[in-house]
Amino acid sequence: MNTPEDSSLGREVAYPSGYDPSLLFPIPRAAGRAAVGLSGALPFVGRDRWHAYELSWLDAHGKPCVATATLHVPCESPALIESKSLKLYLNSLNATRFNSAEAVRARIATDLSTRAGADVSVEFGLPPIDAVGEGESIDALDIAIDDYGPPKADYLATHAGTVVEEVLASALLKSNCPVTGQPDWASVTLRYRGAPIDREGLLRYLVSFRDHADFHEQCVERIFQDLLVRCAPQWLVVEARYTRRGGLDINPVRTSPQMPTPLSIFRDLRQ
């Protein structure tokens, strides 16, 4: 079984001189899910949406082409794709000739699907940037915080009263690469229907990820599971928009299966 320590993270590697799908490094999701009490049927559906900013190849005549792309990895896939390996894989296309842009798109989709163990969709282009963002920010709350990890679900609580449907947001999420320790920065949005979530407790909880080491996808699943258990919403959506590294950013989203309306798709201003 692949582990993060077996990947190219934190190691000097030679950039590929030609197309090489073996560079893609899948990491099973099961271990990360077991750490937060997830096994068997998942309490959510969703995807890991990747934005690729540095995509290039050669056309049939050897002329370079450039593009951006959006990749959707379903959360039901048995494996996630380690980000440095995806960067190296995409770079392996730089000196490779393709007959058409569609051939590039199809090749990337096939290779990612094979490694992830589920159908991965690929489309050229990126979602628009939303400078305002979705939801009501909780970042201006005037509270003192001195707990930066490990993540503490005990901070999460609800208030008795009328059921609400609201969207809350924070730009203060930070976690760290589990191999290199590099900081990962993100804006997080949660949309839910249920008893009102205590906002001070929610902010303390999100800040308690600050010293936590885990992959982006697993952080979002931990947040979803903790909110589900501690706050018992009727339905819930959690999405994090991580900032770019190596020409890629990752945007995991997890939603309750009964989520009534589709999510809007956009990029954060910091992306």
UniProtKB/Swiss-Prot annotation:
Active site (record annotation): 177, 184
Catalytic activity: 7-aminomethyl-7-carbaguanine + 2 NADP(+) = 7-cyano-7-deazaguanine + 2 NADPH + 3 H(+)
Binding site for NADPH: 83-84, 245-246
GO biological process: queuosine biosynthetic process; tRNA modification
A GO cellular component annotation in the UniProt record: cytoplasm
KW NADP (keyword) present: yes
Main location: cytoplasm
Coiled-coil segments: none
InterPro entries: GTP-CH-I_C/QueF, NADPH_dep_7-cyano-7-deazaG_red, QueF, QueF_N, QueF_type2
One Pfam family recorded for the sequence: QueF_N
Transmembrane segments: none
Positions contributing to substrate binding: 81-83, 216-217
SUPFAM superfamilies documented for this protein: Tetrahydrobiopterin biosynthesis enzymes-like (SSF55620)
Record key words, sorted: Cytoplasm, NADP, Oxidoreductase, Queuosine biosynthesis
This enzyme's EC code(s): 1.7.1.13
Family (UniProt): Belongs to the GTP cyclohydrolase I family. QueF type 2 subfamily.
Function: Catalyzes the NADPH-dependent reduction of 7-cyano-7-deazaguanine (preQ0) to 7-aminomethyl-7-deazaguanine (preQ1).
Complexes and interactors: Homodimer.
Designated name of the protein: NADPH-dependent 7-cyano-7-deazaguanine reductase
Source organism (scientific name): Xanthomonas campestris pv. campestris (strain B100)
Gene label: queF
